[in-house]
Amino acid sequence: MFRLAVDIGGTFTDAVLMDEEGHHPVLLSKIPSTPHDYSEGVVNSILRLKSSMDNIESFIHGTTVGTNAIIQGTFKDAALLTTRGFRDVLEIGRGNRVNMYDPFYRMPEPMIPRDRRIEIGGRVNSRGIETEKLDVDDLKYKVRSLIENGVKALAICLINSYANSSHEEEAKRIIEENFPSVQVSISTEITKEYNEYERTSTVVLNALLLHIMNRYLVDLEEKIAFLRFPGKLMLIQSNGGLMTSFLARKIPVHTINSGLVGGILAVRTLGRILGLDDLIGADMGGTSFDVELVIGKNYETTPMMRIKTPSSGPDGYPILIPAVDIHAIGTGGGSIAWIDATSALHVGPMSAAASPGPAAYGRGGTEPTVTDANLVLGRLEASNFLGGEMRVNPEFAKTAVKKISDYYSMDLLEAAEGIIKIAAPSMASAIRTMTVERGIDPRDFVMVSFGGAGPLHANLIARELQINRVIVSTMPGNFSAWGMLTADFRRDYVQTFIMNLEKLDLNDLEGRFSKIESEARKTMTDEGISESNMLFVREVDIRYLGQGHALTISLSTTALQDNDYVEEIDRRFDELHLQRFMHNAPKQAKEIVALRVASIGRTKPSSLSTIKTGSVDPAQDAMKPSRDVYIDGSLKSCKIYDRDRLLANNRIFGPAVIEERVSTTLLLERYVAKVDSYGHLLITPE
């Protein structure tokens, strides 16, 4: 039996088939994505593997369908039901801004217009006590009116429901009994945190995605059933865990950024296999460049993420769910180079995407992209694109890049390298955002480069950041899909709990955590996870008294009855605050605002097969004809290597190009690449 993972990207759809033991992938496929119907690309990628679906026990899927729907605004009509007096929470938002000094700042546009934000009677106070009964007649009347006006989905977010969810649950039950045609989402099924604006934004996004994700997943399940797939379809969540297709249809907001998460799972697993604790994941695909961190062998998460769209402005829409901490910028192989009104050259964030794609694809694209520039520079070989399965035309690439060279009256090669010289520092800056701006020195980390376009730029980025160790993973173009096969089951639980740290009762805290874990244990048992594979991770959100934001602290395994436990929490918060913000106030009073439990159902660990060992010098059959490559302002004669024929212990000295079916690695002068026992390339300065 085998395990299958399929990852939909903005440009390509990747599939990996792995044996049951979790060793090296058996089969890989990479084909262009199909934006008109993403499920078609999934099926095509499976068919390309030429493996019978009835031999596959599990199918894990990472998708960008929900993310793309939000960005593009392709929603079905939805409405918001909220407590009387809170109709404009979505419009008021928060007073803080990403950039306080932007004179052209614009607030996010509400995701639901005011005429579809409806108030209903009923009230619960902040202690969870009902002060006014839910007005059922008012609810029915207003829902009926909304449906008559074409509303297909309802989001319900009532004030203080995090403290008592009975009104939301009652409203949902009444609507489903009386109006079965409309889909309903309530905020407390997603999160029980305070922060009214963020909770409202989250449930609204969930409601907007209900129809889209239901239609997509039902269609996909029908197609894979036709291929005789006997198992369950599982999806990657934004928190890095697995969820069933049934749950994804109910809470689709958890699939946002699902397609990006596989990469960090792969980086974490690779680190564990190689014995590395601290890594930077650098994923460059066709549309974006994504940065993630693994610190102490675990990936970083954030209690809330934001998604930016044309209507959200620079702040983005908040989504109040735990998520892998990913920083993405619009720099990928398909990113378009363009000149602004001041004659400055930019790269991205606009992308040629899968259709029409870079000019070299010959599918109607005419604008110069990063891929076109690399073809012009000789860093990519046209005949080797996707192993020769996809035809690209270097002349089309030259014609596109010539727009830039003609504008600046410069040589074609200089213009092409100019595009790369803008793209690479932009990606380095994205890594600085995740490291330097948080008090972390990237030079202390190992950078793991993957994605189809990643290895081509990895050495350039590392040189910019003075990172001396870079790993180019095996199967870089399918690395994220492989990472999905390493995912565990995971659900996150959050409970608002506001308490001064000095007054904290450890027995009460233990009781609250135990209650959450009891609920989580029952859920995992129902999903067939054995007790021996269950793991619970406790965290608390803490802030200085009077602050409006909190930091999340992982709790140690020390018994809560330990007398030094509160002091340890206090000290660790001060240390994290100093690292993150460059200041702290150890003598300032602190308060806990939320308790968190990550319930994890561990799956079978993955491993990698080793490759044959050779001498320091690569064998002759690993050599391909040399060619001139434009690097650092001049043409250089570069040795070209076939990565599939390299052996462990081989060493390659730059400048050189290492080619494989789905990616190409550029090695600069004064750098050396060593092949390890698994086939990874370790790039270091000579």
Description of each model-found segment:
Residues T188-I224, W482-G511, K515-I516:
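Metal-dependent DNA phosphodiester-chemistry modules and their immediately adjacent helices/loops
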Residues C157-V203, A207, N384, L555-A559, ...:
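Terminal amphipathic helices with adjacent charged low-complexity linkers/tails
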Residues A5-I8, F12-V16, L27-L28, P32, ...:
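Conserved phosphate-binding loops in N-terminal lobes of ATP-dependent enzymes
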Residues D54, A155-N164, N206-L209, A416-I422, ...:
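Conserved short loop/turn motifs at secondary-structure junctions
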Residues T63, C157-I159, S187-E189, S238-N239, ...:
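Glycine-rich beta-strand-to-loop/alpha-helix junction loops that act as flexible
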Residues I8, D137, Y141, S145, ...:
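C-terminal, non-catalytic interaction/recognition modules in large multi-subunit enzymes and RNPs
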Residues A15, E20-T34, A79-G85, Y105-P108, ...:
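Glycine-rich phosphate-binding loop of actin/hexokinase-like ATP-binding domains
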Residues M1-A78, N125, E132-A155, E168-S187, ...:
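N-terminal glycine/serine-rich phosphate-binding loop of ATP-dependent small-molecule kinases
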